[in-house]
C-alpha cells in the first residue's frame, strides 16, 4: 500500500506480510521535498469515523488489555481506565484508553480476541489508542507513535516500526505468542533460573552503610544462601552526597565498593548497586561543566524535568545520549563500577531521555524525548560496557518505557514500587499486583520479571506479608528481598522461607479476561434463616485467581491462589460481609467428574475432597465459613474468607491409597519432597524432604484407612497428629542430608 500526503510532501509505503498466525505490516516513510522535514506524530493504522471499528456482540462488555510498563489492567471497554478511586461516572462521555507495545480486546460472548502490537521498537514507543462511547460505540482506534521531532533529510527514506495483528479464541495465549515473537525477533535469551537478591532500600534507605550490608549478608549466608540468595544489592544511599549521578562512595562506605565486593565474595555473594545512569543532579559538577550533555525543551537547554524526591533534593536533568561525549561519560562511569567488582546493577529512572518534553538535543537525527532511540542507545552502551568486563553480570531494567532495555538487560521491573509493609493502601496494592498479573506473560519472554522488592517484615500485618510473598513466588521471576534480616521476626522468616527457591515459571491469572462471580454473604440473614443469604455480588475486575501447575517426579497438581484485596464491606454498621469466590472447575482446567483433594497452604488446613456432597448442607449458618470450602459442586468450587487476604489451594487428584496432600515448608505444598511412593504390600508411604538445615515444619497426608498409624523421620519414631478432615500431620526438622520419612499403616 502506498499513501501519498501531498500537503506534507511525504509518502508512506506499507507491506502486509501474511504469516501463518498473524499479519505483519512493515512501513517506510519518505520525504518527497527538497528540504529537511520534522517528523512528529505518526499513525500507522487508524479508523477515521464512527462505526469503522466494532468488537463484536455486546461490545460494551468486551474486555480490553492495556499496558503501561509499570501499570497494566484488563477492563471493560465501557469502563474508564482510571482507577476506581479516580474514575468519574461515564454515562455519555467518551472513554479513552491507551497502551504501549501491545493492546488487546476480548469479546466473551463471541469468544474471540484481537491483538495489535509493535514487533519493533528501535526508535519509537508504539502506542495503541481506542475511544468508546456507550451511545455511539467505538469512536476511534489507532496505532502509531510520537516521532520525537526527528529530522528527515530531503529524499530520505526512514524505516518505521513493524506492527502485527493477531486473532484467536484465547486472549492469554495471544499475549504469550506475541511475547514469543518479540523474544525471537530481538534475540532475547532469558535466564534459565530467576535470581534471588537482597536489597537495602526498604530496611535502610539513605542510612545504609557497610556494616548493615555485611550483617545482612552474614545472616543471608546462614539461612538463605542454600535457597538461592546470590546478590547483595546496595540501593540509593552509598553515593557521595546521596547524588543519583555520583559514582563515588560516601563516608558510610569508608572501605569502598571494591573492598565490599571482596568481603561479599568470601561469603559466596555478588555485590549489586543501585544507579540512575541517565539522571544528572543540579548539584553534580557535570551539570555546570557540561550543560551540552543534557537534554532541553523548546524553551531552554538544559531543561530540568523533575525535582529529586530525596536528599539533597534539587532539580534533575536527563543525559543527552545523542551526544558522543555524553556517551563516553556513560561508558566510563559504568565501567568504573564493574571494575570495582559490582556484578548486579539495578538501573533506575531510565525514562528521562524519553520524556516527551525533552526534544532539544545534540543530534536531531536520533530520537530522544518522545521516543526510545536515545534511551536504547544508552542501554546498549551500558550492556556492551559491562559485559566486556564481566560477561556474567546482571542488569535490572527499571523503566516504565519498557522497550528501552528489551534485548539488552536480563531483568525487567514490572510494577510500581511496593513500599514498606503497612503504609501503602490496600487499593494501591490491589492495582499494583493486578498489574503484575497482567504482565505475567512477559516472564521468560521479554526477560525475567521482578515484581518490585519483597517486604514481609513489620510494621504490616502477617496477612499482608503472605499476600506479598504469594505474588512474588507466583510471578515466577526474580525475588528481591528487602527486609532487615537482623531483626526479622521468626513468623515472617517462615513466610520468606516458604517461597524459596523461586518457582522459575509464572502462574496464569485465569480470571483476567473473564472475572468470576464474587459474592457477599450476610451474617445476620444466615443466622436468622439457616440458608445462604447473598448480600449481592461485587463487580470485580480480573487478576484475583492465579493458577500454577507443579510437576514433580512423584506427582502433578495445581496451585490456586485467591486474592481478596479489599477489607470486608459493612452493612448498617453492624456486620461484616464475607467474600465468596464462585470458581468454575473449567476455569481451573480440572475435570469435575474426577475427585480431588484440596489443601490450603497458609493455614495448613486440609479441606477434604471436592466435588463433595458432604459440603452441601440443608441448614447453613455463618460458622460454615470456617471450613473455607463453602461448597464444591460438579460445576463450581466455592471458597469463602474475609479479606484482605490470600488463600493458596493445592489441588491434587484423589488417590485410592494414602498420599501427601500438603506441607508447611514450601508454597507448592510438596515441591520440596522427593521420591514419594506408596507400597501397597507393606502399607508404607515414604519419601524425602529437601530443605535447609534446621527448618521446622510438617507434612500432611490423607486417605488413611486404619486408626493405627506409625511414622519415622530419619529412622527415628515420629509423632503422628490428627489434622483437619481426616488428615494426619508428621512434624519434622530438616537436616543436612535429604530427610527420609515413612508413614506405616498397621492392620486393625
Specify the residue positions occupied by each region the protein language model found.
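Beta-strand-rich recognition/accessory modules
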Residues: 19, 44-45, 83-194, 459
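An acidic-aromatic substrate-binding cleft motif
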Residues: 175-231, 235-240
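Active-site-proximal substrate-binding groove within the catalytic cores of carbohydrate-active enzymes
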Residues: 156-157, 371-651
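Polysaccharide-binding surfaces and accessory modules of carbohydrate-active proteins
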Residues: 1-130, 594
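Surface-exposed beta-strand/loop patches in extracellular or lumenal glycoproteins
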Residues: 38-47, 566-592, 690-706
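Non-catalytic C-terminal accessory domains or segments of carbohydrate-active enzymes
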Residues: 532, 557, 561, 618-748
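Aromatic- and carboxylate-enriched substrate-binding clefts and catalytic-loop regions
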Residues: 226-460, 464, 492
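Solvent-exposed beta-hairpin/edge-strand motifs
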Residues: 47-59, 585-604, 702-715
Amino acid at each position: 500500500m502506498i499513501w501519498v500526503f501531498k500537503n506534507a510532501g511525504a509518502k508512506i509505503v506499507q507491506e502486509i506480510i501474511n504469516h501463518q498466525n498473524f499479519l505483519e505490516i512493515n512501513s517506510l516513510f519518505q520525504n518527497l521535498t527538497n528540504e529537511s522535514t520534522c517528523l512528529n506524530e505518526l499513525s500507522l493504522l487508524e479508523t477515521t469515523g464512527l462505526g469503522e471499528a466494532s468488537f463484536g456482540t455486546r461490545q460494551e462488555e468486551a474486555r480490553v488489555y492495556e499496558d503501561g510498563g509499570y501499570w497494566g489492567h484488563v477492563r471493560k471497554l465501557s469502563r474508564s481506565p482510571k482507577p476506581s478511586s479516580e474514575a468519574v461516572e461515564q454515562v455519555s462521555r467518551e472513554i479513552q484508553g491507551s497502551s504501549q507495545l501491545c493492546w488487546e480486546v476480548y469479546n466473551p460472548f463471541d469468544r474471540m480476541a484481537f491483538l495489535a502490537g509493535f514487533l519493533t521498537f528501535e526508535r519509537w514507543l508504539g502506542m495503541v489508542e481506542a475511544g468508546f462511547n456507550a451511545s455511539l460505540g467505538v469512536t476511534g482506534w489507532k496505532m502509531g507513535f510520537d516521532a520525537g521531532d526527528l529530522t528527515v533529510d530531503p529524499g530520505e527514506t526512514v524505516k518505521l516500526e513493524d506492527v502485527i495483528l493477531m486473532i484467536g479464541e484465547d486472549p492469554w495465549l495471544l499475549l504469550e505468542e506475541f511475547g514469543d515473537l518479540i523474544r525471537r525477533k530481538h534475540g532475547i535469551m532469558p535466564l534459565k533460573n530467576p535470581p534471588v537478591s537482597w536489597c537495602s532500600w526498604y530496611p535502610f534507605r539513605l542510612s545504609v552503610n557497610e556494616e548493615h550490608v555485611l550483617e545482612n549478608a552474614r545472616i543471608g549466608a546462614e539461612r538463605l544462601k542454600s535457597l538461592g540468595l546470590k546478590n547483595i544489592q546496595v540501593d540509593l544511599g552509598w553515593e557521595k552526597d546521596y547524588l543519583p549521578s555520583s559514582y563515588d562512595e560516601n563516608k558510610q562506605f569508608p572501605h569502598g565498593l571494591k573492598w565490599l565486593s571482596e568481603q561479599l565474595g568470601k561469603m559466596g555473594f555478588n555485590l549489586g548497586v543501585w544507579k540512575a545512569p541517565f539522571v544528572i543532579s543540579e548539584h553534580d559538577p557535570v551539570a555546570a561543566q557540561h550543560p551540552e550533555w543534557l537534554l532541553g525543551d523548546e524553551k531552554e537547554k538544559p531543561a530540568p524535568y523533575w525535582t529529586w524526591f530525596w536528599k539533597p533534593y534539587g532539580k534533575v536533568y536527563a543525559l543527552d545520549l545523542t551526544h558522543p561525549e555524553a556517551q563516553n561519560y556513560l561508558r566510563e562511569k559504568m565501567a568504573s563500577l564493574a571494575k570495582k567488582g559490582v556484578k548486579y546493577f539495578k538501573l533506575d529512572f531510565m525514562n528521562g531521555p524519553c520524556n516527551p518534553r525533552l526534544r532539544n538535543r545534540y543530534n536531531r537525527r536520533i530520537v530522544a524525548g518522545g521516543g526510545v532511540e536515545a534511551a536504547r542507545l544508552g542501554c546498549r552502551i551500558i550492556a556492551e560496557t559491562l559485559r566486556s568486563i564481566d560477561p556474567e553480570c546482571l542488569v535490572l531494567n527499571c523503566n516504565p518505557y519498557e522497550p528501552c532495555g528489551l534485548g539488552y538487560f536480563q531483568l525487567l521491573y514490572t510494577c510500581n514500587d511496593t513500599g514498606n509493609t503497612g503504609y501503602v493502601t490496600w487499593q494501591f496494592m490491589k492495582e499494583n499486583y493486578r498489574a503484575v498479573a497482567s504482565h505475567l506473560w512477559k516472564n521468560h519472554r521479554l526477560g525475567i520479571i521482578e515484581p518490585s522488592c519483597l517486604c514481609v517484615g513489620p510494621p504490616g500485618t502477617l496477612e499482608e506479608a503472605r499476600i506479598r510473598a504469594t505474588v512474588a513466588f507466583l510471578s515466577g521471576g526474580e525475588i528481591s528481598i528487602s527486609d532487615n534480616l537482623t531483626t526479622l521476626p521468626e513468623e515472617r522468616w517462615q513466610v520468606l522461607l516458604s517461597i524459596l527457591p523461586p518457582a522459575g515459571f509464572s502462574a496464569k491469572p485465569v480470571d483476567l479476561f473473564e472475572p468470576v462471580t464474587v459474592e457477599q454473604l450476610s451474617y445476620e440473614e444466615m443466622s436468622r434463616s439457616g440458608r445462604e443469604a447473598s448480600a449481592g455480588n461485587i463487580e470485580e475486575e480480573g487478576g484475583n485467581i492465579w493458577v500454577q501447575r507443579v510437576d514433580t517426579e512423584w506427582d502433578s497438581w495445581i496451585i490456586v491462589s485467591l486474592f481478596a484485596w479489599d477489607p470486608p464491606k459493612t452493612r448498617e454498621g453492624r456486620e461484616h460481609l464475607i467474600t465468596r469466590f464462585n470458581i468454575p472447575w473449567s476455569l481451573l482446567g480440572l475435570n469435575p467428574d474426577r475427585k480431588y483433594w484440596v489443601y490450603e497452604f497458609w493455614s495448613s488446613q486440609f479441606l477434604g475432597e471436592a466435588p463433595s456432597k458432604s459440603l452441601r448442607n440443608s441448614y447453613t449458618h455463618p460458622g460454615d465459613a470456617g471450613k473455607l470450602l463453602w461448597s464444591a459442586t460438579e460445576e463450581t468450587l466455592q471458597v469463602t474468607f474475609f479479606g484482605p487476604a490470600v488463600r493458596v489451594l493445592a489441588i491434587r487428584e484423589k488417590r485410592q491409597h494414602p498420599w501427601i496432600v500438603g506441607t508447611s515448608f514450601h508454597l507448592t505444598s510438596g515441591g520440596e519432597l522427593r521420591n514419594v511412593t506408596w507400597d501397597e504390600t507393606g502399607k508404607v508411604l515414604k519419601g524425602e524432604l529437601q530443605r535447609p538445615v534446621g527448618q521446622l515444619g510438617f507434612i500432611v497426608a490423607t486417605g488413611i484407612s486404619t486408626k493405627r498409624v506409625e511414622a519415622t523421620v530419619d529412622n527415628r519414631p515420629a509423632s503422628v497428629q490428627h489434622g483437619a478432615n481426616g488428615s494426619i500431620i508428621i512434624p519434622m526438622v530438616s537436616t543436612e542430608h535429604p530427610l527420609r520419612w515413612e508413614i506405616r499403616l498397621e492392620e486393625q
